Curated annotation (Swiss-Prot):
Reported function: Catalyzes the isomerization between 2-isopropylmalate and 3-isopropylmalate, via the formation of 2-isopropylmaleate.
Organism, scientific name: Caldivirga maquilingensis (strain ATCC 700844 / DSM 13496 / JCM 10307 / IC-167)
Top EC class, one word: lyase
Protein name per the record: 3-isopropylmalate dehydratase large subunit
Swiss-Prot/TrEMBL cofactor(s): [4Fe-4S] cluster
Length: 415
């Protein structure tokens, strides 16, 4: 019987063939943490009395959740982590402004077939390039950094096929929300979701990263796009790397399969207060909105910024709008393309390299009674500020059209 991509990656990492349900030790290819979780990881290592990293070439730190530090406690945490990084000579260190950890892993480090573990639930993002990527808690992360290994229960492989091409106004976010509408939050617990794209060029890396990012929202242990010509092209264009990635065997067996006809999707939103409270934007059009956030590790990429700029060139925003590209590199590209100028002239506040309001940290949290539209990943009560506020999740085009009109708006009339 053939093997799935998950089984191939984890069998290699375990040094033996593994099957779903096996509990086994695996070797980790890439490990990472950010400022908010990193100080907990370092505390665990200090308590154990072993502040060391098994392979500094395979370890990444990024300051993003508390960047730039909004208070003295955040600054204190970053001071501690800078000292830690210097003490062990961390090579892959990204200070304030470089970008959000998951975007940096995607841009600079993760590769197809790797096992990637990081101290954040949205580590699943880098499954976009064909890696098995999973979030870990502080204790497990400390053990990984010290040994380069971790234990894992091998998840069941689940296949999602993406066929045809997305219609105008439909992006990766809508695919993620569609999956949530079908399987609900945590509906794919214990599964490694493998996604197969029928027409690779019609579903680019930015879209894939959004779906993989939100894999954790539908419960997946990992959300891995099966590498194809788009994967190879992306790595060649972005990093000058030529890869021959592994793929599933033709006779691989999955616990179940599901097919999404991309051409039949429409722009979707997740209404308050759950990621699986999914509705077509056409059903909620007209609801007044106070604030729009475009950014995060979910939707702060170049195609998101392009979509927002294309819509917002039509006028001035009627709802306050904050735009945060996910990395310095993306900000620079958006600047060169004229998107930053367009967004600024439309009345948006544009910054970069921070998680900011997505976790209710800073750079634009919502107040009591306010309604927001966000391109982020979560809309639980209190996630982006006041628990008395409401958050709708949407793609960047929907968010931009909403900012332009000051009310929830179907973006297709602007595209």
């Amino acid at each position: 019987m053939g093997l799935t991509l998950t089984e191939k990656i984890l069998s290699k990492a375990a040094g033996r063939q593994v099957s779903p349900g096996d509990v086994t030790e695996i070797t980790v290819d890439l490990a990472a943490f950010h400022d908010l979780t990193g100080h907990h990881v370092v505390e665990v290592m200090e308590n154990i009395g072993a502040v060391k990293v098994w392979d500094l070439d395979r370890f990444v730190i990024a300051f993003d959740h508390l960047a730039p530090p909004p208070n003295d406690r955040a600054a204190e945490i970053q001071v501690k982590l800078r000292k830690f990084a210097k003490s062990i000579n961390v090579r892959n260190f990204h200070d304030v402004g470089d970008g959000i950890l998951h975007q940096l892993l995607l841009e600079k480090y993760a590769l197809p077939g790797q096992v990637v573990m990081a101290a954040d639930s949205h580590t699943t993002t880098v499954g976009a390039v064909g890696a098995f990527a999973q979030g870990m808690g502080a204790s497990d992360m400390a053990a990984i950094l010290m040994t380069g290994k971790t234990w894992l229960m091998i998840p069941e492989p689940f296949l999602i096929r993406l066929i045809n091409e997305p219609a105008p106004g439909v992006y990766g976010k809508d695919v993620a929300l569609h999956i949530l509408s079908v399987f609900k939050a945590e509906g794919l617990n214990g599964k490694s979701v493998e996604l197969q794209v029928e027409k690779p060029k019609a579903f680019p890396m930015d879209y894939r990263a959004t779906v993989s990012n939100m894999g954790v929202e539908f419960g997946a242990d990992a959300a891995i796009f099966i590498p194809d010509e788009e994967t190879v092209s992306y790595l060649s264009r972005s990093r000058g790397i030529n890869v021959k990635p592994i793929t599933p065997d033709p006779d691989a067996k999955y616990v179940d399969e599901y097919t999404i006809e991309l051409n039949k999707l429409e722009p979707l939103v997740a209404a308050p207060h759950s990621v699986d409270n999914v509705k077509p934007v056409s059903e909620v059009e007209g609801i007044e909105v106070d604030y729009v956030f475009i950014g995060s590790c979910t939707n702060g990429r170049l195609s998101d910024l392009e979509a927002a700029a294309r819509i917002l060139k039509n006028g001035k925003v009627k709802a306050r709008c904050i735009v945060i590209p996910a990395s310095r590199d993306l900000f620079t590209k958006a600047l060169d393309a004229g998107y930053v100028e367009t967004l600024t002239k439309a009345g948006c506040v544009v910054t970069y390299g921070t998680c900011g309001p997505c976790l209710g940290g800073h750079f634009g949290v919502i107040g009591p009674g306010e309604t927001a539209v966000s391109t982020g990943s979560r809309n639980f009560k209190g996630r982006m500020g006041s628990p008395e506020g409401k958050v709708y999740l949407a793609n960047a085009a929907t968010a931009a059209a909403t900012a332009l009109e000051g009310r929830l708006t179907d973006p297709r009339k602007y595209l």
